[in-house]
Design a protein with these regions (language model features):
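Accessory nucleic acid-recognition modules appended to NTPase machines
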Residues: 1-140, 144-147
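Hydrophobic/aromatic beta-strand patches that form the interior of the parallel beta-sheet core
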Residues: 81, 153-155, 178-180
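Active-site ExK catalytic segment of metal-dependent nucleases
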Residues: 141, 151-163
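Catalytic cores of nucleic-acid endonucleases
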Residues: 158-180
Length: 180
């Protein structure tokens, strides 16, 4: 089933991806996985139609990418998230990943959904979609700029209490006003 394969492949992308996509877009990354692992007769157009349908149906959502914590470097559709945490958990389980990995991705997905809500009316944060950022060779799970106050926040989704070196450096270099 094409959609089942797309769901599972999207879950794999969520698991492996920490710096954006290898390909130029989520659809190219997804197509390469689906074609390689499931069916070589699926065209790019067919994969794009399936992705568009899933997005319009509210099943998946996209996050952008900010290079160097620069709000002006926004690149759309750099990462995909499921719009339902039950789907997220189900398809991550189908990939065979560990419970710890599932919990980490579900936590990040939850934050994505909350940030997405804050972009909708009444708008609280900037950008078209929630976005992650890169800083050197590292990733910041989400980078947010408030509409009111214009403050920037580097958000790291963790299950523990320790802050990462990357977050401290981002704050020290004044790439974000606050770290969460």
């Amino acid at each position: 089933d094409t959609y089942e394969n797309i769901f599972t492949s999207a879950a794999r992308i969520l698991l492996k991806e920490k710096k954006g996509l290898d390909a130029d877009s989520f659809s190219e990354e997804l197509q390469s996985i689906v074609v390689k692992e499931y069916s070589s007769n699926l065209s790019k157009a067919a994969v794009n139609r399936a992705i568009d349908w899933l997005h319009r149906a509210g099943i998946i959502g996209f996050a952008g990418k900010l290079t160097g914590c620069d709000i002006l470097s926004y690149k759309a559709k750099a990462r995909v998230f499921f719009m339902d945490l039950g789907l997220t958990t189900y398809f991550l389980t189908q990939t065979g990943c560990t419970p710890g990995d599932i919990q980490g991705v579900v936590n990040e997905n939850f934050v994505f959904l909350d940030l997405r809500r804050r972009i909708l009316f009444p708008r609280e944060i900037a950008l078209e979609t929630p976005a992650f950022a890169t800083w050197g060779n590292y990733e910041i799970d989400f980078y947010v700029k408030s509409i009111k106050g214009q403050h920037t926040y580097a958000v790291e989704v963790k299950s523990g209490k320790n802050s990462s070196w990357t977050m401290e450096e981002v704050l020290e270099k004044k790439k974000a006003d606050y770290i969460l």
